[in-house]
């Protein structure tokens, strides 16, 4: 099919006259599809309010209308769910698509790409890391390397990476490698790229997007010497919440849009802990440590519990990912062992079609300031559980018993009413509360600007800025 047909059909699927930036992206996409080179790829970069999501959906619908195969991927379960809702096509996480487990309890190797003539579209690509993770059980430990290798090992398969360079880059990286044409061309790929910068007219009426654009411009111009001033006047979708009104306002959000559509975003685990305790005690009136209906976040990848379920249910996810949100259905059998606290939980996974799973969880991580068990705590748990198998003669057999031990594999969890921005990234909620903590002009860094932009753009309907200082308010 000629490139011109793709252009016409995508514009029709869009349903309105594209902006100049969108038209350029459509033209570039058509050229990318027309290129006969097996190693062509495309980067579609765009910030909040520029119509990137709308354009991505139009591209997906056009490809399907032309009976072309598409696969939609995202780095997290929540991001995949958002991508699927915006495009009308199921999406999955990158890990679930490209890796498969060699054996029970074993590492995950790169799966063969059995698809042919398929376009792989990956949303929220700014989150894709390529720093080799020590002790990673996934492929090479470099997710971007593995993704590129997987896609291009399939006959006539291609990759489109979609994302926002203004968002936080992956932890430990200066920029998002998946959105860098220089980095991607290093794989020997021919890179087509397009940037959406022009904010759509309807987006300019949104206080969230107006202010996000002001913040983004501070990133791109590299001249930020003062903290951004936020405009509240004239925008009903962005409000300042004094601390003494927070409990009542949060309770209103929970009743209006529900817990699944409300999120508090903070700058540290310590601050998130304070919020989580306060919300449970003063908004939800929960006294027990864990109760039915509690929202939790998994804070360390876990393979053990899904393996147990796989034997009887082949639709079970391959693993539970760090960052997955779950809802408690039942709580049973609290006990103390090895110097730690454990509990049996029946969990529901809203981002995975409400999949249900029974696990043993470790509750010591609920209130700690560390992201998960500290190295010292992990070593203590290892030593204590290993001591139980002291009578087992050989070291390999002791390790085998350890890997099959439910307490050593207990799920590490935190409350999920308030999270850090890295944990919120990839997700969107109707009501988002942002607490940046104490800030001065001297504390201004590029990382803070990326943080603030990412936090602002998690909200789809209303943004609440908690204890926002007058010095950062536009007069």
Regions found by a protein language model. Name each.
Residues 2-40:
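Conserved pre-motif I regulatory segment
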Residues 22, 76, 268, 426:
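Short, conserved phosphate/pyrophosphate- and ester-handling motifs at nucleotide-, phospho-/glycolipid
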Residues 27, 31, 36, 40-224:
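ASCE P-loop NTPase helicase motor core
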Residues 39, 323, 416:
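Short coil/loop residues immediately preceding or within conserved phosphate-binding loops
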Residues 337-475:
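C-terminal accessory regions
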């Amino acid at each position: 099919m000629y490139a011109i047909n793709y252009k016409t059909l995508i514009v029709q699927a869009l349903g309105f006259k594209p902006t100049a930036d969108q038209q350029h992206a459509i033209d570039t996409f058509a050229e990318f599809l027309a290129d006969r080179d097996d190693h062509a790829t495309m980067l579609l970069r765009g910030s909040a309010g520029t119509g990137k999501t709308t354009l991505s959906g139009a591209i997906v619908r056009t490809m399907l209308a032309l009976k072309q195969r598409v696969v939609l991927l995202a780095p997290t379960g929540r991001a995949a769910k958002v991508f699927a809702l915006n495009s009308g096509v199921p999406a999955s996480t990158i890990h679930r698509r490209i890796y498969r487990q060699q054996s029970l309890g074993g590492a995950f190797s790169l799966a063969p790409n059995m698809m042919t003539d398929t376009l792989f579209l990956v949303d929220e690509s700014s989150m894709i890391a390529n720093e080799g993770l020590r002790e990673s059980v996934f492929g090479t430990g470099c997710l971007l390397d593995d993704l590129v290798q997987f896609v291009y090992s399939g006959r006539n398969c291609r990759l489109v990476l979609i994302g926002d360079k203004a968002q936080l880059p992956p932890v430990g990286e200066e920029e998002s490698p998946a959105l860098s044409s220089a980095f991607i061309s290093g794989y020997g790929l021919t890179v087509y790229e397009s940037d959406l910068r022009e904010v759509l007219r309807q987006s300019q009426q949104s206080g969230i997007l107006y202010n996000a654009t002001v913040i983004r411009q501070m990133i791109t111009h590299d001249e930020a010497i003062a903290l951004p001033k936020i405009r509240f006047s004239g925008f009903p979708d962005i409000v300042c919440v004094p601390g003494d009104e927070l409990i009542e306002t949060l309770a209103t959000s929970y009743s209006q849009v529900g817990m699944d559509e409300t999120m508090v975003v903070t700058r540290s685990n310590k601050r998130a802990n304070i919020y989580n305790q306060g919300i449970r005690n003063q908004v939800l009136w929960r006294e027990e440590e864990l109760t039915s209906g509690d929202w939790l976040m998994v804070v360390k990848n876990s393979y053990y519990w899904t393996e147990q379920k796989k034997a009887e249910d082949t639709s079970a996810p391959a693993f539970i990912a760090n960052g997955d949100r779950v809802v408690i259905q039942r709580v049973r059998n609290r006990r103390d062992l090895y110097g730690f606290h454990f509990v049996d939980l029946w969990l529901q996974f809203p981002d995975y079609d409400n999949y249900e799973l029974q696990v043993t969880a470790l509750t010591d991580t609920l209130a700690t300031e560390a992201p998960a068990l500290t190295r010292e705590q992990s070593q203590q748990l290892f030593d204590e559980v290993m001591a139980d198998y002291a009578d087992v003669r050989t070291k390999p057999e002791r390790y085998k018993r350890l890997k099959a031990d439910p307490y050593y594999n207990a799920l590490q969890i935190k409350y999920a009413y308030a999270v850090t921005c890295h944990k919120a990234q990839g997700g969107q909620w109707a009501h988002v509360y942002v607490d940046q903590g104490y800030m001065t002009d001297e504390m201004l860094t590029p990382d803070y600007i990326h943080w603030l932009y990412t936090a602002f753009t998690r909200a789809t309907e209303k943004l609440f800025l908690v204890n926002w200082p007058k010095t950062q308010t536009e007069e």
